[in-house]
């Protein structure tokens, strides 16, 4: 798995923790081991530009996902497809505000948003209530299991 992290924000982060989380989620979702993913962290003005350009919505957002080869989660007994999973753009300043409101660390919020972004790249969505329930339960399970395996007690 090739996972590139480009930090263009002022936020100091543990890139290895982001990469470990991404690898864990991709592994659990049975993404091909040679799949590529790019994580980019940007400041609020850069995220706002992307949000307006791609979603036609004002202001910065927390996470945006840009799928490339439209890979889907692997199925038992089938070889997963190779390819580029896509790009995930995270905005640490927005994540920090959300983390404060939720009562947990910014780093945990970024891991949550990363997990959310990977699920979007794999075709999950939350436009409908049943889709939202499925996606949010899956992202919570994936993240809490990842954090527990690393000895973290999540405040999520």
Task: Give the residues covered by each predicted segment.
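An acidic/histidine-cluster motif and surrounding catalytic segment
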Residues: 1-110, 119-156
């Amino acid at each position: 798995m090739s996972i590139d992290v480009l930090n263009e924000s002022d936020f100091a982060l543990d890139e290895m923790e982001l990469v470990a989380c991404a690898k864990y989620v991709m592994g659990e979702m049975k993404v091909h081991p040679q799949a590529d993913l790019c994580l980019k962290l940007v400041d609020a003005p850069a995220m706002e530009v992307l949000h307006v350009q791609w979603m036609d919505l004002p202001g910065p957002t927390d996470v945006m996902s840009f799928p490339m080869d439209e890979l889907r989660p692997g199925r038992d007994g089938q070889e997963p497809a190779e390819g580029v999973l896509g790009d995930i753009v995270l905005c640490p300043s927005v994540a920090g505000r959300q983390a404060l409101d939720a009562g947990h660390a910014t780093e945990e919020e970024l891991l949550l948003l990363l997990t959310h972004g990977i699920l979007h790249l794999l075709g999950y969505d939350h436009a409908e209530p049943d889709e939202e329930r499925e996606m949010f339960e899956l992202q919570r399970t994936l993240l809490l299991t990842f954090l527990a395996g690393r000895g973290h007690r999540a405040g999520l």
